[in-house]
């Protein structure tokens, strides 16, 4: 089994990634490598945030690792909440209920409710230059996953996390929270980004 470090201590995201990757990989969290730091996310884009987190782990622990950042991009709001999705409601940090309430208020009365979830994964690969491992170089790779859909007028379902109760993926009439983990993990933005990461890893 291959071991790979995922730069997160978010148990929801960690379990989702483990479910997607299955038994082929041992996915290790930040806590499991001794990192309890809340790595800052100060980038202006999902790409910058994912790189920032992966770079921190690589610099401090010298291991191959990957990090992700995800944003919900709503067409009628010019792409908001986007990179600020986790902290969309002012004065809150990862408060999903407050974030959803704010988004529903802002879309109240709007006909266009088209939206998409976008995940960017940054994988920093440590490559040993000599057999003893005394010298190494890093390679940076980025993978993107997108799922289109629309925002419901109210919450539906109890599974999942984040904006799942109000996001209805394309070609479905139920929210992510209603579809359940098995279906969501097969079609989600994160699953699509992870699939591209796995495709790359299999070539190694």
Residue ranges of each PLM-predicted region?
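Anionic-ligand binding patches
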Residues: 2-5, 11-204
């Amino acid at each position: 089994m291959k071991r790979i470090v995922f730069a997160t201590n978010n148990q929801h995201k960690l379990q989702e990634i483990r479910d997607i990757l299955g038994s082929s990989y041992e996915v290790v969290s930040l806590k499991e490598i001794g990192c309890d730091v809340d790595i800052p996310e100060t980038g202006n884009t999902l790409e910058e945030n994912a790189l920032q987190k992966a770079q921190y782990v690589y610099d401090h622990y010298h291991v191959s690792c990957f990090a992700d950042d995800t944003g919900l991009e709503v067409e009628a709001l010019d792409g908001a909440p986007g990179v600020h999705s986790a902290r969309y409601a002012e004065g809150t940090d990862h408060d999903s209920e407050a974030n959803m309430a704010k988004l529903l208020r802002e879309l109240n009365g709007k006909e266009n409710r088209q939206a998409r979830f976008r995940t960017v994964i940054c994988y920093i690969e440590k490559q040993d230059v000599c057999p003893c491992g005394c010298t190494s170089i890093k390679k940076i790779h980025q993978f993107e996953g997108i799922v289109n859909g629309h925002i419901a007028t109210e919450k539906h379902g109890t599974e999942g996390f984040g904006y799942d109760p109000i996001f209805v993926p394309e070609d479905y009439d139920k929210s992510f929270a209603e579809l359940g983990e098995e279906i969501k993990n097969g079609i989600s933005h994160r699953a699509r980004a992870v699939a591209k990461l796995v495709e790359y890893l299999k070539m190694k």
